Amino acid sequence: MSMFFMFGIGWFLIVSVCLWLSLLYSCGVGCCWLVGDKVFSGLFVFDSVSFYLVILVLILGFYSQVMFFGLLSTQVRFFLVVSMVFAVLCFCINHSVIFWCVYELSMFPLLYLIFSESPYSERFLASWYFSGYLLSTSLPLILILLYLSYVNGSFFFNEWGYGCNVSLSIFYVLSFVFFTKVPLVPFHTWLPIVHAESTSIVSIFLSGYIMKLGLLGVYRSTFFVFDLTFVGYLFVCCLVAIGFLVTACSELDGKRWLAFLSLSHIVIPFLGFFVSDWISIGYSFFYCLGHGLSAALVFGLLWCFYDVSNTRNLVLLKSGIGGVVSMVIVVFSMLSLCSFPTTIQFFCEVYLVSQCSGLLFYLLFWVCYLFFGGLVPLILCGHLLIRSEYYEFVCVSYHCYYFFLCFLVFWCYFAIVVL
């Protein structure tokens, strides 16, 4: 089926209104100059955090549904849309029980797609890993949310607070339940396995917005626990994040390589919880937007290379570079993982580094993270480009990949201008 469509004036108006509303709302990180920085309606809350995460889902959802219309079956597209709808609701829900429902329901469609659509032999092992973490934490999560709702006398997150004879350990347990979905150490083992055994479109959505659901849950319900009493866990996460970057150097599977990089990158917004105030906390989730776009871009690139060269081995991937266009896309994709200017991650990391000035531990972490985080993608980029024997080819079947990647490159590097 052809991937080229004629869009009428209706589509043009819809896209124009969405872009106009995004410009109207964002006006910088965490700022809404017409209606204030938050919009409450009891059941729903729409703030800068919701805005950036919803934008992430809409970008990934729209471009994947349009560009891969001929590659994805109707069943796959349906389950992806279901997951996106529940994720958007989760980002904007203020009610604890409904939040739990849409939080869990946003992941189940992707779990089903791993079972049903993955062509890899170990997909059942990966599915059991994912479902194990998903189901084992589901019951404790709803029980804790119900208990805190009862103690605080309200189901709405914005009316919760520390007190009311609630032990701080309850909030710590709730935080770790959410950490399993991010995932942070020691709950990280499922992510490389699931990425390696799932289809590329599922990997795009997993790294795109599923990893951010846990951070959102922590922000909504346990935002007040991140103080000096919790900094020991942050210290462990930072050390392990550097270890993930080193581990990525030994990976030959492209998807596992990127999964370990994502495990390292996701520590940055968690660090932002400790060094940011209420005004600047939006930078952590603005970083999530940049990370989601960058991860989706590189997973899409690996998908394209897999179709061209029939391998995910990083040593052999250079055979998939078929000309100047693919070479340019490779360069921009790898640089997005390095937080290269003018990516969203670059500006967020600059701000977070400035917030960490004067704190020796944070500065040491940033030195190691920025060095290895920039070096690892550049090594792969150099390997793919140096002494590469490629031939120029033009094949209509690959245009959908190139358009998808070009659109994501635009958002990775120029979203800071639009948003």
Model-identified regions with their sequence ranges:
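Core, highly hydrophobic multi-pass alpha-helical transmembrane subunits of bioenergetic inner membranes
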Residues: M1-L419
